Swiss-Prot record:
Keyword Flavoprotein attached: yes
Taxon lineage: Bacteria, Bacillati, Bacillota, Bacilli, Bacillales
Keywords: Amino-acid biosynthesis, Cysteine biosynthesis, Flavoprotein, FMN, Monooxygenase, Oxidoreductase
InterPro entries, alphabetized: Diverse_substr_monoxygenases (IPR051260), Luciferase-like_dom (IPR011251), Luciferase-like_sf (IPR036661), NTA_MOA (IPR016215)
Protein source organism: Bacillus subtilis (strain 168)
Protein known as: N-acetyl-S-(2-succino)cysteine monooxygenase
Gene encoding the protein: scmK
Length: 441
């Protein structure tokens, strides 16, 4: 009797006209994509037709004149996902929310509400916010230091999970004859007092269909990996090479085991930026078409942002990246190091580096045929580099349509991706059990 092949987990990261920095300039890109609800509804329905595990929406709380066009004007994620919940029935609905510029009660309430609205499909991507100027939008003058943001995040997540346990499953009786609306023994105050927060509770949203929405985490720095290993059920990451992805995978799984967790209950999903065509030559031509649309000053600015705002204007574009200290930056340390390693390993010039980074934001770029992409994905999963992928289409809507229509069927025929949904909740898609309420007797 042959054992069942390991199933690949698949999400799609939706972003306006697509993830390529110049996607908005492409002739096929819808001009109003980031603020068009009907457009997002069609993307969501396409992803669900492909039986993907989840939709993912990122968020940021600060913009300026140099920000990516997709983020200059876009929907707030909870509002958009609540709308998409009405036109989908199975696919997970996940979004980013910051622990640095939010309160635990707000986040607990928002995701609990989304879980109810979607009948158990909500997931929270925990981030600490990396943009320095965000503080200026929240009555602050300076962004919290990197390690302090993660300390705050750890306490934040524990409070949110505690608030999600405010009500036991059958707490609401609603007995019209006796006038008893709820069982007082099954309502629980949290009464948390910690270093960063004081939260009494209980939450004013009943126990959700999943018990608790799925926790996702995207940090790859030392602090980020520790938080992920301790709290996350799904981990997003940027990994460019098989070997580094395998190292990250092993490190996270080992750390999770040290925290007493089952490593098999954590899905690691790097972003992948696929450019797909019937032939390699046609795929390369599609990639070149997008790359040629990058405005040099925009590409350089994106690279500088990834390097903590360091000014590279004094260095020749066709020369090497100068030696820089990632630890001195208060930005995303994992992405800073990723860029440095790419430059050194592949002997890239600043120009080559900004074109690569600006196009994919540091994620793995794949250029080739549907069969080659299926091969690549299987190789990474089979060699313990990941458990699946967060698909980042360079150009939308074409990118998700091609993936669903041409790549998913290959994975299905190979027996590594389902042909039909086997559950209705995000937890069921990931093989995660419904958490037991901490107060249940």
């Amino acid at each position: 009797m042959t054992s069942k092949k390991k199933q690949i987990k698949l999400g799609v990261f939706l972003a306006g006209t697509g993830h390529h920095v110049a996607s908005w300039r492409h002739p096929d890109a819808p001009s109003d994509a980031s603020m068009n609800l009907d457009y997002f509804k069609e993307l969501a329905k396409t992803a669900e037709r492909g039986k993907l595990d989840m939709l993912f929406l990122a968020d940021s709380l600060s913009i300026d004149s140099k920000s990516h066009p997709n983020v200059l004007t876009r929907f707030e994620p909870f509002t958009l996902l609540s709308a998409l919940a009405q036109v989908t029935s199975k696919i997970g609905l996940t979004a980013t929310a910051s622990t640095t510029y939010s309160e635990p009660f707000h986040i607990a309430r928002q995701f609990a509400s989304l879980d109810h609205l979607s009948n158990g499909r909500a997931g929270w991507n925990v981030v600490t916010s990396s943009i320095e100027s965000t503080a200026l939008n929240f009555s602050g003058e300076k962004h919290l230091e990197h390690h302090l943001r993660y300390q705050r995040a750890e306490e934040f997540v524990e409070i949110v999970k505690g608030l999600w346990d405010s009500w036991e499953e059958d707490a609401f009786i609603r007995n019209k004859e006796t006038g008893e609306f709820f069982d007082k023994e099954k309502m629980h105050e949290l009464n948390h007092k910690g270093e960063y927060f004081s939260v009494r509770g209980p939450l004013n949203v009943s126990r959700t269909p999943q018990g608790q929405p799925v926790i996702i985490q995207a940090g790859s720095s030392g602090d980020g990996k520790a938080l992920a290993a301790k709290t996350a059920e799904v981990i997003f990451t940027a990994q460019n090479h098989l070997e580094s992805a395998q190292e990250f995978y092993q490190s996270i799984k080992e750390q999770a085991a040290e925290f007493g967790r089952d490593p098999e209950k954590i899905a690691i999903m790097p972003g992948i930026f696929p450019i797909i065509a019937d032939t390699e030559e046609a795929a390369q031509a599609k990639y070149k078409e997008l790359q040629d649309l990058i405005i040099p000053s925009v590409g350089l600015q994106i690279l500088q942002n990834y390097l903590g705002g360091i000014d590279l204007s004094a260095y020749p574009l066709d020369g090497p990246l100068p030696k820089l200290d990632a630890e001195a930056s208060n930005a995303v340390k994992s992405r800073f190091k990723l860029v440095q390693e790419m430059a050194e390993r592949d002997n890239m010039t600043i120009r080559e580096l900004y074109k690569y980074v600006a196009g994919s934001r540091g994620h793995h770029i794949f250029v080739g045929t549907p069969e080659q992409l299926a091969d690549k994905m299987q190789e990474w999963v089979d060699t313990k580099a990941c458990d699946g992928f967060n698909i980042m289409p360079p150009l939308l809507p074409e990118g998700i349509e091609v993936f669903v229509d041409q790549v998913v069927p290959i994975l299905q025929e190979r027996g590594v991706f389902r042909k039909e949904y086997e559950g209705t909740t995000l937890r069921e898609h990931f093989g995660l059990e419904k958490p037991v309420n901490r107060y249940a007797k």
